[in-house]
Amino acid sequence: MKQLRIFFLCLMAATLATACGDDNNDDNSVPVESITLNHETLTLKSGATETLVPTIVPDRVTAESVVWSSDKTSVATVSKDGLVTAVAEGTATITATAREKSATCLVTVSNKTLVTTVAELKTAIETADGTADAPTQIILGGYIWVAADAEHFAFSIDGKHIAIDGGNNPIGGNYFISRTASDKSLFELINGASLKLTNLNIYGNADTYSTNIACIFVRASCKLTLGNGFELYSGDGNDNDQLIGISVGDNATLIMEGDAEISNSIKGQEVLVAPTGILQLKGGKIIAREEGTYMSERSLCLQAAINGNQVTIPTVTVENELPADSDFKLDLYDYVLNSFTVRPGAETVVKGTDSYTLTDSDLMKFHLMTNTTGGMTYYDSLFELYLDGNAIKMRAK
Protein backbone atom coordinates (compact mmCIF):
# COMPACT_ATOMS: atom_id res chain seq x y z
CA MET A 1 0.00 0.00 0.00
CA LYS A 2 2.85 2.30 0.90
CA GLN A 3 4.52 1.58 -2.45
CA LEU A 4 1.27 2.44 -4.28
CA ARG A 5 1.10 5.84 -2.57
CA ILE A 6 4.70 6.56 -3.55
CA PHE A 7 3.91 5.64 -7.17
CA PHE A 8 0.98 8.10 -7.37
CA LEU A 9 3.03 10.87 -5.75
CA CYS A 10 5.77 10.43 -8.36
CA LEU A 11 3.19 10.46 -11.15
CA MET A 12 1.66 13.73 -9.89
CA ALA A 13 5.10 15.33 -9.60
CA ALA A 14 5.93 14.40 -13.19
CA THR A 15 2.61 15.79 -14.40
CA LEU A 16 3.17 19.09 -12.59
CA ALA A 17 6.69 19.38 -13.99
CA THR A 18 5.40 18.88 -17.52
CA ALA A 19 2.64 21.46 -17.02
CA CYS A 20 5.10 24.02 -15.70
CA GLY A 21 7.41 23.34 -18.61
CA ASP A 22 4.64 24.26 -21.07
CA ASP A 23 4.84 27.87 -19.88
CA ASN A 24 8.39 28.20 -21.25
CA ASN A 25 8.37 26.14 -24.44
CA ASP A 26 6.64 26.48 -27.80
CA ASP A 27 3.48 24.41 -27.96
CA ASN A 28 2.91 23.31 -31.54
CA SER A 29 -0.74 22.78 -30.76
CA VAL A 30 -1.34 26.46 -29.85
CA PRO A 31 -2.83 28.43 -32.78
CA VAL A 32 -1.18 31.76 -33.70
CA GLU A 33 -3.56 34.69 -33.43
CA SER A 34 -1.29 37.32 -35.01
CA ILE A 35 2.28 38.20 -35.93
CA THR A 36 3.71 41.69 -36.47
CA LEU A 37 7.19 43.03 -37.24
CA ASN A 38 9.06 45.98 -35.77
CA HIS A 39 9.32 47.48 -39.30
CA GLU A 40 6.69 47.53 -42.05
CA THR A 41 9.13 49.22 -44.45
CA LEU A 42 12.90 49.57 -44.61
CA THR A 43 15.17 51.68 -46.81
CA LEU A 44 18.76 50.46 -46.93
CA LYS A 45 21.89 51.04 -48.98
CA SER A 46 23.65 48.10 -50.60
CA GLY A 47 25.55 46.09 -48.00
CA ALA A 48 23.62 47.49 -45.04
CA THR A 49 21.79 45.22 -42.58
CA GLU A 50 18.78 45.51 -40.28
CA THR A 51 17.15 42.97 -37.95
CA LEU A 52 13.41 42.36 -38.09
CA VAL A 53 11.91 41.38 -34.74
CA PRO A 54 8.58 39.51 -34.70
CA THR A 55 5.89 39.90 -32.05
CA ILE A 56 3.63 36.84 -31.84
CA VAL A 57 0.30 36.45 -30.06
CA PRO A 58 0.06 34.39 -27.95
CA ASP A 59 3.59 34.76 -26.65
CA ARG A 60 3.78 31.04 -25.92
CA VAL A 61 4.66 30.74 -29.61
CA THR A 62 8.33 31.70 -29.77
CA ALA A 63 10.34 33.49 -32.45
CA GLU A 64 12.19 30.25 -33.17
CA SER A 65 9.05 28.99 -34.89
CA VAL A 66 9.08 31.82 -37.46
CA VAL A 67 10.02 30.96 -41.04
CA TRP A 68 11.63 33.84 -42.98
CA SER A 69 11.69 34.36 -46.77
CA SER A 70 12.48 37.01 -49.40
CA ASP A 71 10.65 37.23 -52.71
CA LYS A 72 13.71 38.76 -54.40
CA THR A 73 17.02 37.60 -52.99
CA SER A 74 18.88 39.56 -55.68
CA VAL A 75 17.73 42.72 -53.86
CA ALA A 76 17.62 41.64 -50.19
CA THR A 77 18.17 38.41 -48.26
CA VAL A 78 16.98 37.39 -44.80
CA SER A 79 18.49 34.91 -42.33
CA LYS A 80 16.68 32.42 -40.09
CA ASP A 81 16.99 35.00 -37.30
CA GLY A 82 15.40 37.86 -39.28
CA LEU A 83 18.63 39.64 -40.27
CA VAL A 84 17.97 41.51 -43.55
CA THR A 85 20.94 42.23 -45.84
CA ALA A 86 20.60 44.71 -48.72
CA VAL A 87 22.18 43.33 -51.90
CA ALA A 88 21.37 45.63 -54.82
CA GLU A 89 19.01 48.46 -55.74
CA GLY A 90 15.35 47.53 -56.04
CA THR A 91 12.51 46.38 -53.80
CA ALA A 92 11.92 43.07 -52.04
CA THR A 93 9.23 41.78 -49.69
CA ILE A 94 10.43 39.98 -46.57
CA THR A 95 7.81 37.60 -45.11
CA ALA A 96 7.75 36.20 -41.58
CA THR A 97 5.43 33.19 -41.20
CA ALA A 98 4.37 31.63 -37.92
CA ARG A 99 2.12 28.67 -38.73
CA GLU A 100 -1.04 30.01 -40.35
CA LYS A 101 -0.20 33.75 -39.84
CA SER A 102 2.33 35.98 -41.60
CA ALA A 103 3.64 39.55 -41.65
CA THR A 104 5.64 41.40 -44.29
CA CYS A 105 8.20 44.18 -44.57
CA LEU A 106 8.81 46.03 -47.85
CA VAL A 107 12.54 46.60 -48.25
CA THR A 108 13.77 49.29 -50.64
CA VAL A 109 17.45 49.20 -51.49
CA SER A 110 18.64 52.55 -52.79
CA ASN A 111 22.12 53.99 -52.92
CA LYS A 112 20.76 57.52 -53.29
CA THR A 113 21.14 60.05 -50.50
CA LEU A 114 17.86 61.91 -49.91
CA VAL A 115 18.20 65.71 -49.50
CA THR A 116 15.52 68.35 -48.98
CA THR A 117 17.47 71.56 -48.27
CA VAL A 118 20.38 73.53 -49.69
CA ALA A 119 22.49 72.63 -46.64
CA GLU A 120 21.79 68.91 -47.05
CA LEU A 121 22.64 69.04 -50.76
CA LYS A 122 25.92 70.85 -50.05
CA THR A 123 26.84 68.26 -47.42
CA ALA A 124 25.97 65.36 -49.73
CA ILE A 125 28.17 66.85 -52.46
CA GLU A 126 31.08 67.57 -50.11
CA THR A 127 31.05 64.05 -48.64
CA ALA A 128 30.54 62.22 -51.95
CA ASP A 129 33.00 59.37 -52.42
CA GLY A 130 31.81 57.79 -55.67
CA THR A 131 33.89 57.02 -58.74
CA ALA A 132 33.46 57.86 -62.40
CA ASP A 133 32.00 54.38 -62.98
CA ALA A 134 29.93 54.34 -59.77
CA PRO A 135 29.08 57.94 -58.85
CA THR A 136 27.53 58.98 -55.55
CA GLN A 137 23.74 58.94 -55.95
CA ILE A 138 21.72 61.89 -54.60
CA ILE A 139 17.95 62.40 -54.89
CA LEU A 140 15.98 65.56 -54.11
CA GLY A 141 13.02 65.15 -51.79
CA GLY A 142 11.43 68.48 -52.69
CA TYR A 143 11.83 71.94 -54.23
CA ILE A 144 15.19 73.55 -53.39
CA TRP A 145 15.42 77.35 -53.44
CA VAL A 146 18.86 78.98 -53.47
CA ALA A 147 18.74 82.32 -51.66
CA ALA A 148 20.19 85.47 -53.16
CA ASP A 149 22.90 85.53 -50.47
CA ALA A 150 24.23 82.11 -51.48
CA GLU A 151 27.94 81.63 -52.03
CA HIS A 152 29.48 82.51 -55.40
CA PHE A 153 28.96 78.95 -56.57
CA ALA A 154 26.01 77.54 -54.68
CA PHE A 155 27.26 73.99 -55.27
CA SER A 156 30.93 73.42 -56.11
CA ILE A 157 31.79 69.90 -57.26
CA ASP A 158 35.54 69.58 -56.83
CA GLY A 159 36.89 66.35 -58.30
CA LYS A 160 33.74 64.48 -57.23
CA HIS A 161 31.66 62.05 -59.28
CA ILE A 162 27.97 62.59 -58.59
CA ALA A 163 24.58 61.76 -60.08
CA ILE A 164 21.61 63.86 -58.93
CA ASP A 165 18.05 62.65 -59.47
CA GLY A 166 15.78 65.65 -59.03
CA GLY A 167 12.78 63.50 -58.21
CA ASN A 168 10.90 65.74 -60.69
CA ASN A 169 11.56 68.71 -58.39
CA PRO A 170 13.05 72.07 -59.38
CA ILE A 171 16.09 73.98 -58.21
CA GLY A 172 15.54 77.72 -58.50
CA GLY A 173 16.85 81.03 -57.26
CA ASN A 174 17.55 84.67 -57.98
CA TYR A 175 21.05 85.44 -59.17
CA PHE A 176 22.13 89.04 -58.86
CA ILE A 177 24.58 89.08 -61.72
CA SER A 178 26.51 92.29 -62.28
CA ARG A 179 30.06 91.35 -63.24
CA THR A 180 31.19 91.64 -59.62
CA ALA A 181 32.42 89.32 -56.90
CA SER A 182 28.80 88.84 -55.89
CA ASP A 183 27.94 87.04 -59.13
CA LYS A 184 26.17 83.76 -58.46
CA SER A 185 25.97 80.40 -60.19
CA LEU A 186 24.28 77.09 -59.39
CA PHE A 187 26.93 74.45 -60.12
CA GLU A 188 30.64 74.55 -60.84
CA LEU A 189 32.55 71.41 -61.90
CA ILE A 190 36.32 71.54 -61.39
CA ASN A 191 39.35 69.22 -61.21
CA GLY A 192 38.02 66.39 -63.36
CA ALA A 193 34.59 66.24 -61.72
CA SER A 194 31.61 64.57 -63.37
CA LEU A 195 27.92 65.26 -62.79
CA LYS A 196 24.77 63.66 -64.20
CA LEU A 197 21.41 65.40 -63.78
CA THR A 198 18.06 63.67 -64.36
CA ASN A 199 14.41 64.43 -63.50
CA LEU A 200 15.40 67.97 -62.55
CA ASN A 201 14.19 71.43 -63.55
CA ILE A 202 16.60 74.36 -63.24
CA TYR A 203 15.26 77.88 -63.61
CA GLY A 204 17.59 80.87 -63.77
CA ASN A 205 16.24 84.33 -63.03
CA ALA A 206 17.92 87.62 -62.26
CA ASP A 207 17.46 91.36 -61.95
CA THR A 208 20.58 91.99 -64.03
CA TYR A 209 22.20 89.69 -66.54
CA SER A 210 25.82 89.33 -67.46
CA THR A 211 27.77 87.31 -69.99
CA ASN A 212 30.12 86.66 -67.07
CA ILE A 213 27.95 84.02 -65.47
CA ALA A 214 26.28 80.70 -66.20
CA CYS A 215 23.83 78.45 -64.42
CA ILE A 216 26.38 75.63 -64.69
CA PHE A 217 30.12 75.93 -65.29
CA VAL A 218 31.87 72.83 -66.65
CA ARG A 219 35.56 73.60 -66.27
CA ALA A 220 38.46 72.01 -68.14
CA SER A 221 38.45 68.20 -68.32
CA CYS A 222 35.12 67.86 -66.47
CA LYS A 223 31.98 66.15 -67.75
CA LEU A 224 28.30 67.06 -67.42
CA THR A 225 25.59 64.63 -68.56
CA LEU A 226 21.97 65.74 -68.88
CA GLY A 227 19.54 62.82 -68.96
CA ASN A 228 15.83 62.02 -69.00
CA GLY A 229 13.58 64.52 -67.28
CA PHE A 230 16.18 67.31 -67.19
CA GLU A 231 15.13 70.81 -68.21
CA LEU A 232 17.12 74.03 -67.97
CA TYR A 233 15.47 77.37 -68.68
CA SER A 234 18.15 80.04 -68.73
CA GLY A 235 15.79 82.96 -68.22
CA ASP A 236 14.94 86.23 -69.90
CA GLY A 237 17.68 88.58 -70.97
CA ASN A 238 17.86 92.24 -69.99
CA ASP A 239 18.92 94.74 -72.65
CA ASN A 240 21.87 93.21 -74.52
CA ASP A 241 23.22 91.15 -71.64
CA GLN A 242 22.79 87.42 -71.58
CA LEU A 243 22.50 84.68 -69.04
CA ILE A 244 24.34 81.54 -70.11
CA GLY A 245 22.72 78.21 -69.41
CA ILE A 246 25.85 76.04 -69.47
CA SER A 247 29.46 77.07 -70.03
CA VAL A 248 31.69 74.25 -71.34
CA GLY A 249 35.43 74.79 -70.90
CA ASP A 250 38.41 73.50 -72.88
CA ASN A 251 38.54 69.69 -73.00
CA ALA A 252 35.29 69.62 -71.04
CA THR A 253 32.30 67.58 -72.22
CA LEU A 254 28.56 68.18 -72.23
CA ILE A 255 26.41 65.15 -73.10
CA MET A 256 22.67 65.32 -73.69
CA GLU A 257 20.60 62.12 -73.52
CA GLY A 258 16.96 61.05 -73.57
CA ASP A 259 14.52 63.95 -73.48
CA ALA A 260 16.83 66.48 -71.79
CA GLU A 261 16.06 70.06 -72.86
CA ILE A 262 17.84 73.40 -72.69
CA SER A 263 15.90 76.52 -73.66
CA ASN A 264 15.78 80.27 -73.16
CA SER A 265 13.59 83.26 -73.92
CA ILE A 266 14.35 86.35 -76.00
CA LYS A 267 18.05 86.61 -75.13
CA GLY A 268 20.66 84.37 -73.62
CA GLN A 269 22.86 81.49 -74.61
CA GLU A 270 21.93 77.94 -73.83
CA VAL A 271 25.47 76.64 -74.26
CA LEU A 272 28.78 78.48 -74.48
CA VAL A 273 31.55 76.17 -75.71
CA ALA A 274 35.31 76.73 -75.51
CA PRO A 275 37.50 75.90 -78.56
CA THR A 276 38.24 72.33 -77.50
CA GLY A 277 34.99 71.80 -75.62
CA ILE A 278 32.73 68.92 -76.67
CA LEU A 279 28.96 68.85 -77.07
CA GLN A 280 27.57 65.34 -77.68
CA LEU A 281 23.91 64.97 -78.64
CA LYS A 282 22.82 61.40 -77.89
CA GLY A 283 19.30 62.75 -77.46
CA GLY A 284 17.57 65.79 -76.03
CA LYS A 285 17.14 69.16 -77.66
CA ILE A 286 18.28 72.76 -77.53
CA ILE A 287 15.73 75.45 -78.35
CA ALA A 288 17.02 78.97 -79.05
CA ARG A 289 14.04 81.33 -78.99
CA GLU A 290 14.04 84.70 -80.76
CA GLU A 291 17.53 86.18 -80.21
CA GLY A 292 18.70 83.30 -78.05
CA THR A 293 21.56 81.15 -79.31
CA TYR A 294 23.41 77.97 -78.51
CA MET A 295 26.71 79.58 -79.45
CA SER A 296 27.26 83.31 -79.89
CA GLU A 297 29.79 85.89 -80.96
CA ARG A 298 30.99 85.88 -77.37
CA SER A 299 32.53 82.44 -77.98
CA LEU A 300 36.15 83.54 -78.37
CA CYS A 301 37.02 80.55 -80.52
CA LEU A 302 34.36 81.47 -83.06
CA GLN A 303 35.53 85.08 -83.12
CA ALA A 304 39.13 84.01 -83.64
CA ALA A 305 38.17 81.66 -86.45
CA ILE A 306 36.18 84.33 -88.23
CA ASN A 307 39.21 86.61 -87.94
CA GLY A 308 41.33 84.05 -89.74
CA ASN A 309 43.18 82.58 -86.77
CA GLN A 310 44.01 78.89 -86.80
CA VAL A 311 41.90 77.75 -83.88
CA THR A 312 39.40 74.97 -83.43
CA ILE A 313 35.70 75.75 -83.53
CA PRO A 314 33.87 73.53 -81.03
CA THR A 315 32.13 70.69 -82.80
CA VAL A 316 28.70 69.31 -82.01
CA THR A 317 28.50 65.51 -82.31
CA VAL A 318 25.05 64.19 -83.23
CA GLU A 319 24.50 60.51 -82.35
CA ASN A 320 20.73 60.24 -82.98
CA GLU A 321 18.10 62.03 -85.04
CA LEU A 322 17.43 65.45 -83.54
CA PRO A 323 13.92 66.32 -82.29
CA ALA A 324 11.79 68.19 -84.81
CA ASP A 325 11.65 71.36 -82.70
CA SER A 326 15.40 71.60 -82.05
CA ASP A 327 16.76 75.00 -83.06
CA PHE A 328 20.53 75.62 -82.98
CA LYS A 329 21.71 79.13 -83.84
CA LEU A 330 25.24 80.44 -84.29
CA ASP A 331 25.13 84.18 -83.63
CA LEU A 332 27.41 86.07 -86.06
CA TYR A 333 26.29 89.57 -85.06
CA ASP A 334 29.70 90.99 -84.15
CA TYR A 335 31.37 89.56 -87.23
CA VAL A 336 28.83 90.96 -89.63
CA LEU A 337 28.67 94.30 -87.83
CA ASN A 338 32.44 94.76 -87.92
CA SER A 339 32.98 93.19 -91.35
CA PHE A 340 35.45 90.60 -90.09
CA THR A 341 37.15 88.56 -92.76
CA VAL A 342 36.76 84.81 -92.87
CA ARG A 343 39.73 82.54 -93.45
CA PRO A 344 39.59 80.34 -96.56
CA GLY A 345 38.04 76.92 -96.38
CA ALA A 346 35.27 75.64 -94.19
CA GLU A 347 34.79 75.05 -90.49
CA THR A 348 33.11 71.85 -89.28
CA VAL A 349 30.47 72.79 -86.71
CA VAL A 350 28.46 69.54 -86.57
CA LYS A 351 29.45 65.94 -87.25
CA GLY A 352 27.72 62.58 -87.24
CA THR A 353 29.07 59.29 -85.93
CA ASP A 354 29.85 55.83 -87.26
CA SER A 355 26.37 54.76 -86.20
CA TYR A 356 24.44 57.86 -87.30
CA THR A 357 24.63 59.76 -90.58
CA LEU A 358 23.50 63.37 -90.71
CA THR A 359 20.62 64.22 -93.05
CA ASP A 360 19.17 67.31 -94.70
CA SER A 361 16.62 67.33 -91.89
CA ASP A 362 19.44 67.76 -89.36
CA LEU A 363 20.97 70.52 -91.48
CA MET A 364 17.71 72.49 -91.33
CA LYS A 365 17.91 72.59 -87.51
CA PHE A 366 21.16 74.57 -87.52
CA HIS A 367 21.21 78.24 -88.47
CA LEU A 368 23.56 81.18 -88.81
CA MET A 369 21.89 84.31 -87.55
CA THR A 370 22.45 87.95 -86.69
CA ASN A 371 20.56 90.54 -84.71
CA THR A 372 18.95 93.36 -86.66
CA THR A 373 17.06 96.44 -85.58
CA GLY A 374 13.75 95.26 -84.28
CA GLY A 375 14.61 91.60 -83.97
CA MET A 376 16.59 88.66 -85.31
CA THR A 377 17.08 87.30 -88.79
CA TYR A 378 18.96 84.32 -90.15
CA TYR A 379 22.11 85.55 -91.85
CA ASP A 380 23.01 84.04 -95.19
CA SER A 381 24.53 86.81 -97.31
CA LEU A 382 28.14 86.18 -96.22
CA PHE A 383 28.05 82.72 -94.62
CA GLU A 384 26.34 79.44 -95.20
CA LEU A 385 25.97 76.02 -93.61
CA TYR A 386 26.04 72.98 -95.85
CA LEU A 387 26.07 69.19 -95.57
CA ASP A 388 29.39 67.64 -96.55
CA GLY A 389 29.40 63.88 -96.13
CA ASN A 390 28.67 63.21 -92.48
CA ALA A 391 29.36 66.77 -91.35
CA ILE A 392 27.72 70.18 -91.36
CA LYS A 393 30.22 72.89 -92.26
CA MET A 394 30.29 76.69 -92.27
CA ARG A 395 31.97 78.68 -95.01
CA ALA A 396 32.05 82.15 -96.47
CA LYS A 397 30.10 82.63 -99.67
Please report, for each region that a protein language model flagged, where it lies by residue:
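Extracellular/surface-exposed low-complexity segments
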Residues: 5, 122, 283-284, 298, ...
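C-terminal motif of bacterial Sec signal peptides marking the signal peptidase cleavage site
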Residues: 16-19
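Extracytoplasmic soluble-region selector
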Residues: 21-112
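Acidic Gly/Asp/Thr-rich repetitive segments characteristic of extracellular carbohydrate-active
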Residues: 59, 112-141
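Detector for repetitive beta-architecture
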Residues: 91, 135-137, 142-143, 154, ...
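Short, T/G/N/S-enriched strand-turn elements that build extracellular solenoid repeat scaffolds
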Residues: 120-131, 146-157, 164, 185-189, ...
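Extracellular beta-strand-rich solenoid/capping regions of secreted or surface-exposed proteins
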Residues: 146-163, 174-199, 203-224, 246-251
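Beta-strand-rich solenoid/repeat architectures in extracellular/passenger domains
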Residues: 169-183, 198-212, 224-242, 254, ...
